Amino acid sequence: MPSKKFNGDPTTRELILKCARTEIDQYGIIGLRLSSVAEKAQVSVPLIYKYFEDRDGLLAVVLGDWYEEFVFRYRAMIDGWIDSASRITLEEFAQLSPKPQAGAMQKDREFRLQVLATALENPQLHRRIKALTIDAHAWSATAIDRVIPKLPESDRHFDRRFFSLLLFNTMYVFYDLLDTERIDDEQYISFLVHLVRASSHENFNARNN
């Protein structure tokens, strides 16, 4: 590991990152070759090493940036929705959870798994995703805090672990491999609402009896 960080030209650095991302889009994470990135960016491989130390260093930045964009795009969508709503039903709130049928999000969902798998062998990427995940978990708690006052009174008392633990960890890794026994989004939301509402009503009744 170099003892001194190489700053270099920000424009060149961004060009290398852009070309690396294009390579990953075309050939996947495993197919990323520094020689191809260098050719596209019209720089030398040794220069890439100066900026990113090695292939893992380049991957850590490119995939870390992608993961951050993925997380914050989702957060911005939810924040905007919560802020714009004066009242929220439990059914509407449940729509924000990950769903079995990813639709247009399927590609991102699959790529996210690849990024997480890469992070297991890439300490720099692992540290960045860990920090983003800790921040996202804290954000999810504040999002719940903002939603609860807008729900009907009897639906406000659910066990928060439905969202902070179960749904936070839901990725449908094995579900996507099934050919049968699949559930559509409407059925899933109905099932989720039933569980959360039952929890809320049980806690609500216990506090008022």
Tell where the protein language model's regions lie, with residue ranges.
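N-terminal intrinsically disordered/low-complexity leader segments
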Residues: M1-T11, F204-N209
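Helix-turn-helix
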Residues: T12-L15, C19-G57, V61
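Solvent-exposed, amphipathic alpha-helical segments
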Residues: L15, C19-Q26, F72-G80, F111-V115, ...
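Short, basic, alpha-helical segments at the C-terminal edge of helix-turn-helix-like DNA-binding modules
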Residues: L34, G64-V71
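Short loop-to-helix capping motifs
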Residues: D54, T118-P123
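Hydrophobic alpha-helical connector segments
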Residues: V61, Y74-R109, R160-L165, I189
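Amphipathic alpha-helical packing segments from all-alpha helical-bundle domains
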Residues: V71-F72, A102-L113, P123-P149, S190-V193
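Hydrophobic/aromatic-rich alpha-helical bundle segments in the mid-to-C-terminal region
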Residues: H126-K130, V147-N209
